[in-house]
């Protein structure tokens, strides 16, 4: 049997040093945005019962879930998303809370992906859920928070595309079409394949109205700015479809009033395989990443599976894809705190330790040297990105070497602190 002890499974990744630091900074920045927007963070178990995710509206197919068994033979899964566990927590532990609930999270989720497709099996998601209100104010709050979250990490040139789940449902609810053909139709529209769509509709056009036929035929073309809404309205008299278009229009206008409309576009061809979303849906895109970096929308039917009927909306950001985009845009933010290495003679350990603690309290990254040789200390410091080397060697003033300028000085402790705070 082959020994795999030096490898990791497909889709997994070790994240080291600089990359890890950048990722944690992104996560911290997103948490700040949520916190100062009134959201409370929650943490759910990595392992859940399979039954939590086994419903007819589950957004993640069961074949995409990592499954295992407990000692009683019950099926468990590594959580494939965070929204469903939050629905479980809300339905079972938050019935007496004050609504609307504003919850946030940053956690790893796990999905089985085909080999060699380049997708991760472990993904860091960061997002919010607004639970207990079904007005467009909460939809706007969710979308605006998403925009501010992406801006906060330094992302440039992104777009949030708005759609409406009820729009496509309204156009197709009276169609006599098999489930497999409906899935095929959705896929064609999502891929904006005009030729395949015309061929597909020509084969079944006699089964629904000419008006609906024309609108569905044009769905792949109905994307762009707010003018698309009026264009779509001119193609239908379907009351439910018109209501969906009005909802998108009103949400857009609210975002426009805030001044963030530059980040918004409309895509009426945004459809889903499973009837998970019930209202506005949105996805975030950036040129540097092929897939969406953010997805969200209204899902009013999920939490009722856990014992309480509550409307909800929210979004999830793919932190790993954000890192890819920031790297390509050359806008990754590194930790800018100064780094100090203190070396010392053994009899001055206590003084060196106390000074290190003082610097840490001032948010300066500081460590005591584990090396004694001068050359080794210098080499270590350069490779580690240390800014200053400080030496406790018995003199009244301390040895200080600035590794950026290569200058050496002998300074008192308060002078060193002033230097490091510049």
UniProtKB/Swiss-Prot annotation:
Record GO cellular component, one term: cytoplasm
Subcellular location(s) per record: Cytoplasm
Primary localization class, coarse: cytoplasm
Gene3D superfamilies on file: Bira Bifunctional Protein, Domain 2
Molecular function in Gene Ontology: catalytic activity, acting on a protein; histidine-tRNA ligase activity; transferase activity
General function of this protein: Required for the first step of histidine biosynthesis. May allow the feedback regulation of ATP phosphoribosyltransferase activity by histidine.
Lineage, top ranks: Bacteria, Bacillati, Bacillota, Clostridia, Eubacteriales
Protein known as: ATP phosphoribosyltransferase regulatory subunit
A Pfam family assignment: tRNA-synt_His
Quaternary context: Heteromultimer composed of HisG and HisZ subunits.
Pathway per the UniProt entry: Amino-acid biosynthesis; L-histidine biosynthesis; L-histidine from 5-phospho-alpha-D-ribose 1-diphosphate: step 1/9
Keyword Amino-acid biosynthesis included in the entry's annotation: yes
PANTHER family assigned to the protein according to its UniProt record, in alphabetical order: ATP PHOSPHORIBOSYLTRANSFERASE REGULATORY SUBUNIT, HISTIDYL-TRNA SYNTHETASE
Gene Ontology BP, a term: L-histidine biosynthetic process
PROSITE patterns linked: AA_TRNA_LIGASE_II
